[in-house]
């Protein structure tokens, strides 16, 4: 048995809420970005992203599912021909919500919801940089270990030289009184 969603309804009834979201999604796909209240934008996001996921699949069955919601065939064609293929390599996160200043009349919190138009080049660049740094890290550790090994060898040689110098100084210091006595004699 179908159960209604919990929480407040946008527009009062379930049918009006469905109509609101269908109209908001149509406007979003038609214009790329729309300004609406913050709560409607937050509720529209999963609704619109599911439609984009259907468009990515691109089958006739998915097109018919989208046509149940969006009645404008031109918008559905745009969704399947342009928007879906654009996000083919992206796993979710097709929309962005940006909060703006409150509405002047009733001070309602407003937001802009838009389709993300940037490719994920930055995330691919970050991923490549992380892989490169992770490959360089073991090499850097090997260099650090080699430097530490050289440093320990140098420290040992330095310590040996210091010990020899101290022994030489003590030997000359011990020989010095004997040399003075020999001069006096």
Swiss-Prot record:
GO terms for molecular function: structural constituent of ribosome. It holds the Pfam family Ribosomal_L17. It comes from the Bacteria. Keywords: Ribonucleoprotein, Ribosomal protein. GO terms for cellular component: cytosolic large ribosomal subunit. InterPro entries: Ribosomal_bL17 (IPR000456), Ribosomal_bL17_CS (IPR047859), Ribosomal_bL17_sf (IPR036373). GO terms for biological process: translation. HAMAP family: Ribosomal_bL17 (MF_01368). Part of the 50S ribosomal subunit. Contacts protein L32. Belongs to the bacterial ribosomal protein bL17 family. This is Large ribosomal subunit protein bL17. It comes from Rhodococcus erythropolis (strain PR4 / NBRC 100887). The lineage of its organism: Bacteria, Bacillati, Actinomycetota, Actinomycetes, Mycobacteriales.
